[in-house]
Curated annotation (Swiss-Prot):
Subunit structure: Interacts with SAK1.
Top-rank taxon: Eukaryota
Record key words, sorted: Acetylation, Nucleus, Phosphoprotein
GO molecular function, one term: protein phosphatase regulator activity
A biological-process GO annotation: cellular response to glucose starvation
Compositional bias ranges of the Basic and acidic residues kind: 11-34, 247-260, 959-972
Main function: Involved in RNA processing and negative regulation of glucose repression. Regulates the level of two antigens, P43 and P70. Binds to protein phosphatase type 1. Functions with REG2 and SNF1 protein kinase to regulate growth. Might regulate SNF1 directly or indirectly.
Protein's name in the database: Resistance to glucose repression protein 1
Keyword Nucleotidyltransferase attached: no
């Protein structure tokens, strides 16, 4: 392969011509077969994802014109001397893409020529995809590279003419430029300049040469500014440090030109200190040790806090007052130890105090002092700084300082006793003494590990640990009987000596480890302490007796008291009581006695973990400790220990016999049906019992009508079963679920009782028969349709036009939750009135529903004309109670215009309702009220009723004088049989909604004479 692309094209001219001739004549060439043998169209995938750019040229000129032109974007003719002028490529023709398919069309003619074309295309394929100068060394370009061939590219480019070079940087940059120049990856002209500049710079630095003046070389530096930017390669040994320094010099977002200007003034500055911290922090050994120490300190504090709250259990009725701010009181107590006059007496007393504390302390002394007090001076300084840190009030420190002088003299008197005593546990209560001493040492521990000797007094140390507080503080409200308020003054008098004594002696409130001190004490004269030197023993006994009396008195009344074991602190010599005079004087200004209302309980922690932790529990099951969040993606059961937080009696919450809580499946109602039935029966029975005395009933049409109805076994409905427990007018036709079986309906026939006993469910159904059924169904049957499979006597619906029984069983079993429109071939809904026990007076009191689609049909003489009425959608009741009584009648309340509540859809009334003026009944019956009607509208409805009439000749024989008129109407039914039933239904719906709501009791009685008219 040639090292130059142009020479490569020129040297391959003969081969290219052979390719062209071979493509034109479709002949094979042995020379191309030697180069690439065995190539076939099946091996096209070896070429990669590129599309073949082979072009079929007719002659040499066409070939040169259509060959690729490898353009150089920044060459500017710098490489023209390397290119043969006769072989300059003109550019790629646009018809190259149009001729792509020609190669593939001719490829099937000769396989050897295809192999040669593939070889030709391989030579150009690697150069056609680049817009920069391609590498001439094609062999190295085709070699696949792995991670070992990755070369770190320089991150910065500097001006080679003005940059201050290091010798290692010069050599590394020079090597990098030479390497890139050999691989033809850089501009050759610029690479030559960079190589020359780097070599000159290296020679200057190596030989310590001086810079040549610009005037010597005739260079106008001010006007002719020349830049020669190139890559700079850092030294690999100090790469990390140098890169960091140069990044700081360069600044964020600076370009190459500004980087040179920024780097000059920043070299002398402390750039490392001003550098921002990296995002990914790598902790040093110092930080690890410091964090570990802070963690240990936090654990020690946590332990001390737990011990403080645990001491409340030992003394739950301890001295509680408004000054139970442990932090503030601890600061006051520590101030009296560390703010002292620098005298020999106090120093000796403090030494004895600290040496005594070391023996009784349970927390290791962090200062490292020995029993001889060798480190007492350092400890005193640290304690002094700690006291300065916690001190908040300067005046308080002054008052404490005066008390300290008295206690210092007391400790001086008892110094020999403290140093010579072999037994360090001389306290009546060693536990409380140890707690107090541990608190004193803990202050020193806190000041050592958390404070800087020069800065801790001003600002606290940040806690870098991220942790979650699982501590639960608990308290309890205290209630006192009213009788205790009378004894408060006596309690205060009994506690005067004790309070003052304990305030001077720094007693422990509630047996906590935090020493407390009164805030409001006045300065006590020094001579009182001197006077006390002669009364040490007597005062000790007095304070003990006073404390004991106070303790017994407080135990009797449940108030505040201090145990006697805490009052005898004077034996230790560390704290000595003051004189009686000072006690009396200071008690007048001491804090007022305040009754506590809140009692602190021991704190607890939230316990949570996996199911393995619960295996050791008292119960095997999780019980109600299982998390109720069932939508979690945890791989274990999340346990929450409720008993650790609520310390009350939780025995009723615990499961029995390892009973676990399970999730209720979706769709299951936890409200039992038994509870609903009980509530429903209660409401329903009350409604029935309260309305039994006001039950209006439908009046029977006549004795003949009743005889005809039972003789023909029509599907009639008993109005004794018709009542309502609702007073709403929108609930005339509603779904109900009343199952009842009462004995007050024994006069009904047997078929009625069978239908009532099987009525259940909430749905609409068609009536089982029309006109020829042997069963008389009541209104209750419409509200409670029986299941067809449970009814032994199945009634087939009657065909509407022919009067025959419809044997379609689907119609029998149809239970529809929503009423459907009535088709001409479907059965009818009827509303029959069949009651043998009805009276005329009851019928007069019977109001009809307002919002219904019913058609009131008259009982024709000698015929029965049930009407076909369309269904109507109803609003369901919000509650659907059930009753065990299957024969409880739904009745309309006498004193309300509310409609009846029945469960039928659309029903046709067969029977007689006394009509009022301008009502449907009077018009259809054709009685005396005909003259008052709208003839055009009423005639249309009457004609519809005639069309719906079923021809039943057997029933015409039982009619009275009106048989001739009935026969004439049946003839009109035959003539108008082509009338659409849908139109009749619409007319009936409109007229029913217009007239049925206006029936009144006052209009019923005058219309009894028109029962038999049609």
């Amino acid at each position: 392969m040639s090292t130059n692309l142009a020479n490569y094209f020129a040297g391959k001219k003969d081969i290219e011509n052979e390719h062209v001739n071979r493509n034109a004549s479709h002949e094979s060439n042995s020379k191309s077969d030697v180069k690439i043998s065995g190539n076939d169209n099946d091996n096209d995938e070896d070429m990669g994802p590129s599309v073949s750019m082979a072009v079929q040229a007719k002659n040499d000129d066409d070939f040169h014109k259509s060959t690729f032109n490898l353009k150089r974007t920044r060459s500017m003719g710098l490489l023209d001397e390397y290119i043969d002028p006769t072989k300059k490529l003109l550019g790629r023709s646009d018809d190259l893409y149009d001729n792509d398919n020609e190669y593939y069309d001719n490829s099937s003619n000769n396989s050897s020529s295809n192999s040669s074309d593939d070889d030709y295309d391989d030579g150009y394929q690697e150069h056609s995809t680049s817009v920069s100068p391609p590498p001439a060394d094609n062999d190295s370009y085709l070699i696949p590279q792995d991670d070992n061939d990755v070369v770190v590219e320089p991150e910065r480019h500097v001006d080679y003419l003005s940059h201050e070079w290091k010798e290692s940087e010069i050599s590394n940059s020079w090597k990098y430029i030479i390497l890139k120049k050999k691989k033809r990856d850089v501009d050759l002209v610029n690479a030559a300049r960079l190589e020359n500049a780097s070599w000159r710079t290296w020679a200057k630095a190596r030989n310590n040469l001086k810079t040549v003046s610009p005037e010597v070389v005739n260079w106008s530096k001010d006007s002719d500014v020349t830049w020669l930017y190139g890559p700079i390669v850092r030294d690999s040994e100090g790469n990390a440090q140098s890169e960091e320094e140069h990044d700081l010099e360069r600044g964020y977002g600076s370009d190459d030109e500004n980087s040179k200007r920024i780097s000059m003034p920043t070299k002398n500055s402390k750039s490392i200190a001003a550098a921002p911290k990296p995002i990914l922090k790598k902790r040093t050994v110092t930080e690890i040790i410091e964090d570990n120490a802070l963690w240990k300190l936090n654990e020690a504090r946590k332990h001390m806090t737990e011990m403080k709250h645990a001491s409340v259990i030992m003394d739950p009725n301890g001295n509680k007052n408004v000054h139970d701010d442990f932090d503030a009181l601890a600061a006051q107590v520590n101030a009296q130890y560390y703010h002292y006059p620098k005298e020999s007496n106090s120093s000796v007393s403090l030494k004895s105090q600290h040496s005594d504390k070391k023996d009784n302390s349970t927390i290791p002394n962090p200062v490292g002092e020995n029993s001889n007090g060798g480190g007492d001076k350092g400890e005193e300084d640290l304690h002094l700084k700690s006291a300065l840190h916690v001190q908040n009030n300067r005046s308080t420190a002054q008052s404490n300082k005066s008390i300290l002088e008295n206690s210092t003299n007391d400790r001086k008197a008892n110094l020999d006793q403290n140093l010579n005593s072999p037994d360090n546990n001389r306290f009546p209560s060693s536990t409380s003494s140890s707690n107090r001493d541990n608190e004193n040492n803990s202050m020193g521990l806190s000041s050592i590990l958390t404070s800087n000797p020069s800065e801790k007094s001003n600002k606290p140390t940040k806690n870098r640990h991220i942790h979650f507080n699982d501590r639960v503080e608990q308290c309890m409200a205290l209630r006192y009987p009213a009788s205790q308020s009378e004894d408060d003054e006596s309690d205060d008098e009994n506690k005067q000596y004790v309070d003052v004594n304990n305030n001077a002696n720094v007693t422990t409130i509630n047996n906590n480890r935090t020493p407390l001190l009164a805030i409001q004490h006045k300065s006590i004269p020094i001579n009182s302490a001197t006077e006390h030197l002669n009364k040490n023993t007597s005062d000790d006994d007095t304070s003990s007796q006073s404390s004991s009396s106070s303790h017994s008195d407080d135990e009797e009344h449940g108030g505040l008291y201090i145990n006697a074991r805490f009052s005898r602190r004077s034996d230790s010599g560390v704290h000595s009581p003051i004189t009686d005079n000072s006690s009396v004087a200071s008690s007048t200004t001491s804090r007022a006695h305040v009754r506590p209302i809140i009692k602190l309980l021991p704190d607890t922690t939230l316990n949570y973990g996996s199911d393995e932790e619960s295996d050791n529990g008292e119960f095997n099951g999780y019980g109600n400790a299982v998390s109720h969040n069932v939508n979690t993606s945890r791989g274990y059961d999340y346990i929450y220990d409720y008993n650790s937080v609520y310390t009350g009696d939780t025995s009723s919450f615990l499961p029995v016999d390892s009973c676990d809580i399970v999730d209720v499946p979706e769709g299951m109602d936890l409200q039992t049906a038994i509870a609903d039935d009980n509530a429903s029966n209660y409401e329903f029975n009350n409604a029935v019992e309260s309305k039994e005395k006001h039950v209006p009933q439908l009046h029977k049409a006549s004795a003949n009508n009743t005889t005809r109805q039972h003789g023909s076994h029509m599907l009639l409905y008993d109005d004794d079963n018709y009542s309502s427990s609702s007073d709403s007018e929108q609930q005339f036709i509603e779904d109900s679920q009343y199952n009842s079986s009462d004995d007050e309906e024994e006069e009904d026939d047997d078929d009625q009782e069978v239908d009532d006993n099987h009525d259940e469910g909430l749905s609409l159904r068609r009536t089982l028969s029309l006109g020829k059924s042997g069963s008389t169904n009541s209104l209750y049957d419409l509200a409670q349709p029986s299941l067809s499979s449970a009814t032994p006597q199945q009634k087939n619906p009657t065909n509407f036009t022919g009067g025959k029984t419809d044997v379609d069983k689907d119609a029998q079993l149809a239970v529809r939750p929503y009423p459907l429109k009535r088709n001409s071939s479907s059965g009818n809904f009827i509303f029959n009135s069949d009651s043998e026990e009805e009276s005329s007076s009851e019928e007069e009191q019977r109001p009809l529903p307002a919002n219904s689609q019913l058609v009131n049909r008259s009982v024709l003489k000698g015929s029965v004309t049930p009407a076909n009425i369309s269904s109507q959608k109803k609003k369901a009741l919000p509650k659907q109670p059930k009753a065990s009584d299957s024969s409880q009648s739904f009745r309309i309340v006498n004193n309300t215009p509310s409609p009846a509540e029945v469960g039928a859809s659309d029903v046709a009334i067969e029977g007689y309702f006394s009509p009022r003026n301008e009502s449907i009944k009077s018009v259809v019956s054709g009685g005396n009220m005909m003259d008052h009607q709208d003839h055009s509208e009423m005639d249309t409805l009457a004609k519809g009723f005639e069309n719906c009439h079923i021809n039943n000749a057997s029933k015409l024989k039982d009619k009275k004088v009106d048989s001739v008129q009935t026969t004439r109407k049946e003839a009109s039914l035959t003539d108008s049989s082509n009338e659409s039933l849908h139109k009749v239904v619409q007319n009936a719906r409109g007229m029913a909604s217009k007239y049925l709501h206006s029936w009144k009791k006052s209009d019923v009685k005058p219309q009894e004479n028109g029962n038999d008219s049609s």
